[in-house]
């Protein structure tokens, strides 16, 4: 699947499912590299990895490249269109060939997963600015609870997105975005 197809899918989902999508385009390669950088300095051995909100897979792609044969990656995506797209990407794009059997796409809400500590690293691409504070708290509590001792959690927030959203948000949304 070429980049422009993924971008079209992403933009369509942004328009139709803004609350859970939150970005106009998929994350770029530089962000994906930064998000998975922890794999380069963590003690190596079999690792269990979790990606929350992988979308069309830019972070998944870099994580797959950094995985060793004993690693596994669960990519948890709530959006069925993104989950289906990511499965196709993993099954058909050559960059995933080496790690294809080690990656599982799970279509569900992260809060529905068991909270036992089992992951060495978690990469999170959720649009936290779209969520209410209690939702953000529940998401972070769940992810931190899923990390093994010494595990790493990588997440990001788009720079200036709060100020860009303010003119379009209702009163309640403006209060939330102002912090």
PLM feature segments, named:
Residues 83-115:
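S-adenosyl-L-methionine
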Residues 119-135:
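A short SAM/SAH-binding and catalytic strip from SAM-dependent methyltransferases
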Residues 46-55:
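Conserved class I S-adenosyl-L-methionine
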Residues 56-69:
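Conserved SAM-binding loop of SAM-dependent methyltransferases across substrates and taxa
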Residues 137-149:
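A short glycine-rich, Lys/Arg-flanked "PGG" loop and its adjoining helix->strand segment in the class I
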Residues 5-42:
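Class I SAM-dependent methyltransferase Rossmann-like catalytic core
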Residues 150-159:
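Conserved beta-strand signature within the Rossmann-like core of class I S-adenosyl-L-methionine
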Residues 79:
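Conserved SAM/SAH-binding beta-strand->alpha-helix loop
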